[in-house]
């Protein structure tokens, strides 16, 4: 394999932007579906490590049980009269914690928003768990016996009409799939792939409702619409696999073209650990001379259409991807540079996250999982200069085994226009949606960041990772960072406040979430809290200048990578659709698992400063608590 020469930025990848070029906290595309009125209500419960340790003394274990059997026993003992199935996405994380996920059923039909996740420690005992199982009255009769529900085609028509989807169903035919009561629709137009439907229950307002879960990928939205099984113009709830935001980037360490110049980099996979065993241009079966490999397929998409496989990519038999860029050029004049930049940024981030624990078993994005678990066949499709929009970006995350899809847009906020592919923060923010949606609730369930507060954390994680990666040697606790400033051509960035540990510069506390009804604003609060976490850990452990983390006893040795690792591990512990308090507890539990709780007080100091103190009680009204634990 020839050496790869990238005229990409070898420094730092920035972060993500909220989607609109003004400081209104909104990421809704003008042509998209507003799912806010259809979000599921929060129902998750989480038993953090301390409470779990006290509870499981009375729980019966067998030394012969594997971690899946132990987890199954816990669910059975907690809900002895309920039925459920084991989701086939269990794995043991790089921190030694086993993760097992369960889906509640009724009459053999999934209750789609009723989940139970169990995390098993190295000692074989339950470490933490969470659940949103339905505990109300079950339907007495099996709906499959009387078949007293609508035809799935009517459900598709109802979703299209109610949500005003750009899909034409006139000739739709429901073709049965192998899985019971699951159908693919043929004869439609307007969607990027054939719509699907599956008969499921959902819990809502204390009752179970039988619905058709209608799946439609229309580009700006990839929706799961829960259509009433009888009244098919009633849509109970909607989940969107697509997450939007606005950002810009240059290279690893450089946030955007204002921070440095393009740098020649040779064989970058040699410095990014074991995440890419086939290099960035092979998948174990094929070697490519274009910007495609096991992790990423990067190409332009000026039409904004669904096709990507045969779209234009830079091609170099010598793997010398060296192209010109100037701020005086229009984006279409440097598309080779932009595609190469996007390919470099996403592959580097893939490898960094791999080292931190986003592996094949955890549901990462790869064509060939090389026998290491997970589903495979799901590398990320990354479109540069996508013509389906401007001044934004998005990432669609279906379950493990289906391709993630990133669409990066140009920005018309300056003359000449600017290309979001050159602001690493935007790229990192978007790819982080793939990370969080695969880890929260398990790789097979991409519905676990749909509720408003949980969805806000999905946005906040994107900002957090983009900002953490952007930090530079010489930065201190007093260093502030904005979001999307270059791409949006907006001094101060696109968020309400810059990320800062100074309460005068950024006064956000958890109580501010009370008045918010949009995920990007909530995400800014969550990322503000995590910025405090980041700097407390850097103050304790320092900050490495290396791209990849170094580990001591399984934990990153520097504060930046430790913060990124604990936040990632926390995602794997928390329940489906968590709230801020549950996410806080999961991060503290992640530290307990990784370092035996050495950083508990540094973490709680950060959370307490912003209102999530030791005595905070989650309720309808969010009231700050600034208390530290007694043992700190």
From Swiss-Prot:
Signal peptide: 1-19
Record-linked Pfam families: FTP (PF07504), Peptidase_M36 (PF02128)
Glycosylation site residues: 270
Cofactor(s) listed: Zn(2+)
Localization, UniProt: Secreted
GO cellular component: extracellular region
Family to which this protein belongs: Belongs to the peptidase M36 family.
Protein name: Extracellular metalloproteinase 2
Lineage of producing organism: Eukaryota, Fungi, Dikarya, Ascomycota, Pezizomycotina
Gene name tied to this protein: MEP2
